[in-house]
Amino acid sequence: MNTRRELIASPYLKLLGVIIDEAKYPRSRLLLAWRENLVNPMGTLHGGVIASLVDAAMGCALLSSEEVKGIVTTELKVNYFRAVTSGIVKVEGEVIHRQGSVAFGQAYLYCEEDLVALGSATYKLY
């Protein structure tokens, strides 16, 4: 799975409304418009959505490699810095290290130029 069309076809990303703006190894950029059906009881973008975006950005960066056929997230960490109450969310993912069947990546999530969250993850490649 390494073509842009295959990445876009992800049912989960479709459900969230994610737009894959760029996916060229070792980087990706995803976009998501804030919507009421993605918020928590306080009216801000749900933390699980943010974690999903962080994971998806790094996953798209990895899967855009010709050599990577599939991935499994083995660890995911997200640091949250501020709430998202409206606007367009941009996530930039990057593969930082890849060796053998393991890869590590980072992603930065922004809303209107403000850093909202920073995430890192480890992946098993196959």
Q: Where would I find each of the regions flagged by the language model?
A:
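Terminal targeting signals and extreme-terminal segments of soluble enzymes
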Residues: 1-126
